[in-house]
Amino acid sequence: MAAVTVTGAASLPARADSTIIDDWSKAKLPAPPQLKPVTLDAKTTALLVMDFTVQTCTPARRPRCADSVPKVKKFVEEARGKGALIIYSVAVPKSVPGDILKELTPAPGEQVLPPLGPDKFIASDLEKTLHDKGIATVVAMGTQAQTSVLHTGGEAALRGFKVIVPVDAMSADDLFPELYTAWHLSTAARISNQVTLTKLDMIGF
């Protein structure tokens, strides 16, 4: 059998051994997601007001969270007045409902989920509550964006709920996690088609 000669091999580039960490600074930000107006049916909508507590939502730790509180308060009060379901959560281990910011104090009878971690569906009756109340749409608001909003909002989408995320009602310790959360929820397979990004003043009932 005749020998086979491979030509041009020396001109092939050497295999790159860099990782995403090495190439981190080369990344370019994608275009920002589009924000869309939303009209909600209060009877089939639940607000998830996640982890707005004295431990997590302070001007020193998360100024964007602290700045969002007046707008979140106004929106929660409007939704409550229209009859929407309001569900709260606390995040820090051993935190209690009394740790929720006074501006966002739950009304009598409104559920407060205990510290459950990033995904509020895990080890809770949240999905059952939503189904029992006839909820089809959830509005995910909270801090941190990359934990409670990303994981609970994403999981709600995977469980078949429509998910509304007002980007001015989610926050983190710095900007990048907020950008990533918005990007992920608006692009991830099986999640993005259930998620709408918006602003609080673009939501009506």
Residue ranges, per PLM feature:
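C-terminal segment of classical bacterial N-terminal signal peptides
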Residues: V4-P13
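Generic anion/oxyanion-binding catalytic loop in active/binding sites
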Residues: T5, R61, P115
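Active-site-adjacent betaalpha module
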Residues: L12-A46, G81, P93-F205
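Acidic/histidine-rich helix-loop elements
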Residues: S18-K26, C57-A66
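Acidic/histidine-rich, surface-exposed loop or edge segments in extracytoplasmic proteins
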Residues: L48-P59
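A short alpha/beta connector and helix-capping loop motif
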Residues: R61-A79, A84-I87
